[in-house]
């Protein structure tokens, strides 16, 4: 193995690394190791360039050398990289980048061109300011221009360079490129014209001599990139305008001579490239495109093609004759669509400069006067309805041959790739943009044309196209049409007419379903929807054609998902529809996409009609899951079904509610697989798995079933999720919240996973997103409320060990304090703890004080963690800062319930007898008076105002079924929250009695003399007011 880096040794190592005889051998491994060692040495990349430029080296050596070179540019070209290529070596490399222009191997040249483009992206214009001048000199070289290989290779380099520079949106290289491209544009136009002339006029051109054809196409491709990326306002550059005008004449000539030129494979690429040029221009800026002098000619050319070639497009079969005319017509329709949308929005785009408004106004005026006249618009509508909205013979053939595959394509196909969906989209744009002209025109046309049709299949397909136009124009014509009447008088009779052939009936039933799919969300009464549900139930029962069945399923799903869906209207048909989906449709389909669609439809119906589906039917739906889950998790091609099954399970659990334990045998193993970080399916399924897990816990009811220990076995999976999935942290915290409500504190805190998670949350408390922050505080509050007297020490001990208490005090003592709203929420947890055990809280505060940094250490800390307290300060001073901050935050609390929580907490501190707390007695007493003035509690301590934001009320239970968890939380608050169970007056009286007992009668009286007499009088007055009657 060579050890010193030189060209000869490098060639030898490259040969050993690339020789097929050495594949996976020790020789190859040692060679690759040597290359890795050399790649950080100065001169390595220059030698690689020398080797692949040397034609005497073998192709395999040169190939590996250029690949190594290109990868090295990515890794080491930037000067900021470790082991960056030296500046002088980079200059030498740049000087030879274009020496490969006589390379005969196309793939090698492409690799070099890509490397050159990457270097240009990094070095132009600062380190390589002459890039475009260098290209200009090459293009001007007479010798090079006469050599088709050299000129082709230069164009390949320019294509890659412009492509890469054009994608840059930050930095100077794109503006610099735009200032330089005028140097090379005329030269490339000259090359294009010369080569285009050669191949289009030569009578002897054959398959062996296609160099001019190749050069011409590549030059056109480069020009397309330069014009679209190199000019912000192409209409202002004469060279660009001249070329585009010329290109339109070439486009027309190529289209008109299709029969002569179609023998060349590259011919279609010319048409597509020109179409892409015009499409990219209109997409980049419709106004700039319209203001091109030849824009009207482009639009007229494509519109004429759409008119004239419509019969060819209609009869074209991509499997037999190709899809040239279809794709060309699609490009034309997409260009028209962009222009129509621009007119519809009246140029509503982001203006970058004041002149943009003038440009937009000018372009709209031009397009309306030169192109979009009434005759053209109505002829477009006629042509679309006559040819492009009609089902084509190839479509009918595919429908009858493989209906399931065909309907899947119909539901999934983008309008940019198939002619009929594209035509439908453009038709809708026309109707919405020119509604004043087209709505009366269309309605009259539908009425007149429909009456003239015969019984032939061709006319039947025309009728389907007429109905399609009615379907697509729903939004535009809804105010002028009585759809409810048409449904009864026209569409329902058509869909149930058994006097026509089976093929025709299938077509009309599909169309009626699609019409309802569109109109049901626009204008359709509940009575009409009921008729539609009845019709669809009959379709699903009697029809066997999968296209009709699945179109019906699609429409049912649309109606169920509509914001205006009324489940009571659907209820009479609900059970039968679910039965049919479950027992007929799902077993009959074989494609993954179809199963997925049916499963998602079932999911939507379950959740939208909750709680109308019976328990038995929900359990029947549940039984389909195990078999499908087995297929989805063991077959990669069916894996996408697993997520749909998880969502279906989640909705079943939600719908079953307190009976959701019936899903446990299936759901718990599914959650275990989906949420286990070591599972192969984890990345794909975990998010839906966590949501299902949460739903199972939220719907668990202890009245119906004991809690399964398997749920506790799942808990360790949460830790990995918390650490790695910050985007779904709220979902994971909701799961922990559910466990906090279900488990008793001993079981909860005995689980190490929860303790580890609390440590994480404590560490990042103030960095959490608001929703996660709220949930963390809710969990801690639930644990405090769940606390029984026997668990009091355990709770505080665990809060101490997991850093919860430290996190709370850290947050409120920050120099850069959070908002008073956040502070009040944090202190609310302290208030809860204080009420439970104020002495323990103050003991911890003393420990916290002992562990604080000194004032000097604190001053050296980053501002974000610097505190207003330090070890140098007295403990009394720290307590005083706590109380002062607490009272300030209290002023921003407006909910009476939360006010009482804080008052109970801060008042409980009086029981510690600490001097700094007693010093604040007047402030605390003022809070008592303010609160007593605002509320009037029952003897038990409850009050209407404490229930203003309750989820569980008589009204909510009547209108919205609540989960077991919501009821569980409500019961916890009702039974354990002192806000609802401790009379504030009694609590105040007891606090005063405690002070008297603690201080002794004499000291107590002395203490009262220090308090403002009027404050004590007001307090005594409020304490004497009788409470209101307790609520039953």
From Swiss-Prot:
Subcellular location field: Cytoplasm; Nucleus
Q: Which GO terms describe its biological process?
A: protein import into nucleus
The record's annotation in InterPro entries points to: ARM-like, ARM-type_fold, Importin-beta_N
Importin N-terminal domain location is 31-103
This protein's GO CC annotations: cytoplasm; cytosol; nuclear envelope; nucleus
Which UniProt keywords are listed? Acetylation, Cytoplasm, Nucleus, Protein transport, Transport
| A GO molecular function held by the record | nuclear import signal receptor activity
> Which Pfam family is one of this chain's hits?
IBN_N
Which positions carry N-acetylalanine?
A: 2
The record's note on quaternary structure and interaction partners says: Interacts with GTP-bound GSP1 and RFP1. Associates with the nuclear pore complex.
Q: What is the additional note? A: Present with 6300 molecules/cell in log phase SD medium.
In the record, the note on similarity to other proteins reads: Belongs to the importin beta family.
List the PANTHER family hit by this protein, alphabetically: IMPORTIN-11, IMPORTIN-7, 8, 11
**What job does the chain carry out?**
Functions in nuclear protein import as nuclear transport receptor. Serves as receptor for nuclear localization signals (NLS) in cargo substrates. Thought to mediate docking of the importin/substrate complex to the nuclear pore complex (NPC) through binding to nucleoporin and the complex is subsequently translocated through the pore by an energy requiring, RAN-dependent mechanism. Required for nuclear import of Ho endonuclease and RFP1, and involved in rRNA-processing and assembly or export of 60S ribosomal subunits.
Q: What is this protein called?
A: Importin beta-like protein KAP120
Native source species: Saccharomyces cerevisiae (strain ATCC 204508 / S288c) (Baker's yeast)
């Amino acid at each position: 193995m060579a050890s010193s880096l030189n060209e000869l040794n490098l060639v030898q190592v490259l040969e050993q690394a690339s020789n097929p005889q050495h594949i996976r051998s020790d020789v190859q491994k040692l060679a690759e190791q040597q290359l890795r060692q050399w790649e950080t040495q100065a001169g390595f990349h220059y030698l690689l360039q020398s080797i692949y430029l040397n034609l005497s080296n073998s192709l395999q050596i040169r190939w590996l050398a250029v690949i190594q070179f290109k990868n090295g540019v990515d890794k080491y070209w930037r000067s900021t990289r470790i082991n960056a290529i030296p500046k002088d070596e980079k200059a030498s490399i740049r000087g030879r980048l274009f020496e490969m222009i006589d390379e005969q191997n196309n793939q090698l040249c492409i690799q070099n061109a890509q490397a050159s483009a990457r270097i240009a992206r990094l070095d132009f214009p600062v380190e390589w300011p002459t890039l475009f001048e260098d290209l200009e000199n090459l293009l001007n070289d007479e010798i090079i221009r006469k050599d088709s290989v050299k000129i082709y290779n230069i164009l390949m380099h320019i294509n890659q360079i412009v492509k890469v520079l054009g994608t840059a949106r930050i930095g100077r290289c794109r503006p610099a490129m735009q200032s330089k491209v005028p140097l090379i544009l005329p030269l490339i136009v000259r090359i294009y014209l010369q080569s285009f002339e050669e191949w289009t006029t030569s009578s002897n051109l054959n398959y062996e001599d296609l160099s001019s054809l190749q050069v011409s196409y590549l030059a056109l491709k480069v020009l397309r990139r330069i014009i679209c990326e190199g000019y912000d306002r192409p209409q202002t550059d004469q060279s660009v305008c001249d070329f585009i005008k010329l290109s339109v004449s070439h486009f027309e000539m190529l289209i008109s001579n299709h029969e002569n030129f179609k023998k060349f494979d590259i011919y279609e690429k010319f048409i597509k490239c020109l179409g892409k040029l015009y499409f990219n221009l209109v997409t980049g800026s419709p106004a700039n495109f319209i203001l091109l002098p030849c824009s009207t000619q482009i639009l007229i050319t494509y519109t004429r093609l759409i008119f004239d070639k419509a019969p060819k497009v209609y009869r074209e079969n991509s499997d037999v004759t190709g899809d040239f005319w279809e794709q060309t017509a699609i490009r034309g329709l997409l260009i028209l669509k962009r222009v129509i949308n621009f007119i519809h929005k009246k140029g509503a785009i982001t203006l970058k400069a004041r002149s943009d408004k003038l440009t937009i106004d000018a372009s709209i005026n031009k397009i309306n006067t030169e192109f979009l006249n009434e005759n053209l618009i109505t002829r477009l509508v006629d042509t679309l309805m006559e040819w492009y909205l009609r089902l084509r013979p190839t479509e009918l053939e595919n429908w009858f041959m493989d209906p399931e595959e065909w309907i899947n394509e119909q539901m999934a196909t983008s309008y940019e790739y198939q002619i009929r969906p594209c035509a439908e989209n453009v038709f809708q744009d026309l109707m919405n943009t020119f509604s004043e002209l087209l709505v009366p025109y269309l309605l009259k046309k539908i009425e007149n044309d429909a009456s003239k049709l015969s019984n032939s299949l061709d006319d039947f397909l025309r009728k389907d196209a007429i109905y399609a136009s009615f379907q697509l124009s729903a939004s535009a014509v809804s105010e002028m049409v009585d759809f409810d009447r048409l449904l009864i008088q026209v569409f329902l009779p058509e869909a149930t007419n058994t006097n026509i052939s089976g093929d025709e009936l299938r077509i009309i039933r599909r169309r009626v379903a699609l019409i309802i799919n569109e109109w049901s969300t626009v204008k359709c009464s509940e009575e009409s929807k009921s008729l539609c549900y009845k019709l669809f139930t009959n379709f699903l029962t009697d029809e066997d054609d999968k296209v009709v069945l699945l179109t019906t399923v699609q429409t049912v799903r649309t109606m169920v998902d509509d914001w205006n869906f009324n489940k009571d209207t659907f209820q009479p048909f609900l059970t039968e529809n679910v039965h049919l989906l479950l027992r007929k449709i799902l077993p009959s389909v074989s494609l993954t996409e179809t199963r997925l669609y049916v499963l998602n439809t079932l999911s939507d119906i379950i959740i939208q009609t909750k709680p109308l589906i019976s328990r038995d039917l929900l359990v029947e739906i549940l039984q389909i899951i195990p078999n499908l889950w087995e297929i989805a998790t063991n077959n990669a091609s069916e894996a996408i079904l697993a997520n749909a099954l998880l969502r279906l399970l989640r909705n079943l659990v939600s719908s079953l509610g307190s009976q959701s334990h019936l899903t446990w045998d299936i759901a718990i193993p599914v959650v275990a697989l989906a949420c286990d970080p070591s599972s192969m399916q984890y990345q794909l399924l975990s998010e839906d798995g966590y949501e299902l897990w949460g739903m199972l816990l939220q719907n668990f009811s202890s009245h119906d079933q004991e809690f399964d220990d398997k749920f506790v076995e799942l808990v360790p999976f949460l830790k990995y999720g918390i650490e790695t999935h910050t985007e779904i942290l709220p979902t994971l915290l909701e799961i922990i919240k559910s466990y906090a409500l279900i488990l008793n504190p001993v079981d909860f805190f005995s689980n190490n996973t929860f303790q580890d998670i609390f440590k994480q949350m404590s560490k990042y408390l103030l960095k959490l997103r608001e929703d996660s922050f709220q949930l963390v505080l809710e969990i801690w509050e639930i644990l405090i409320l769940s606390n029984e007297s026997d668990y009091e020490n355990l709770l505080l001990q665990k809060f101490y060990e997991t850093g919860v208490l430290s996190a709370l005090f850290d947050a409120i003592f920050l120099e850069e304090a959070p908002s008073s709203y956040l502070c009040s929420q944090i202190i609310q947890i302290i208030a809860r703890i204080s009420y439970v055990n104020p002495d323990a809280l103050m003991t911890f505060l003393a420990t916290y004080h002992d562990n604080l940094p000194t004032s000097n250490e604190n001053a050296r800390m980053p501002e974000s963690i610097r505190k207003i307290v330090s070890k140098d300060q007295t403990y009394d001073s720290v307590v005083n800062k706590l109380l002062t901050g607490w009272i300030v935050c209290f002023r921003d609390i407006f909910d009476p319930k939360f006010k009482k929580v804080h008052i109970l907490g801060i008042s409980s501190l009086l029981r510690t007898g600490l001097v700094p707390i007693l010093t604040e007695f007047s402030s605390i007493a003022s809070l008592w008076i303010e609160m007593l003035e605002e509320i009037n509690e029952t003897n038990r301590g409850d009050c209407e105002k404490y229930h203003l934001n309750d989820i569980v009320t008589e009204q909510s239970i009547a209108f919205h079924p609540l989960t077991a968890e919501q009821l569980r939380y409500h019961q916890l608050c009702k039974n354990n929250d002192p806000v609802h169970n401790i009379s504030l007056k009694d609590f105040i009286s007891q606090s005063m009695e405690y002070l008297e007992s603690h201080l002794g009668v004499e000291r107590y009286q002395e203490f009262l003399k220090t308090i403002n007499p009027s404050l004590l009088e007001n307090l005594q007055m409020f304490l004497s007011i009788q409470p209101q009657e307790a609520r039953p």
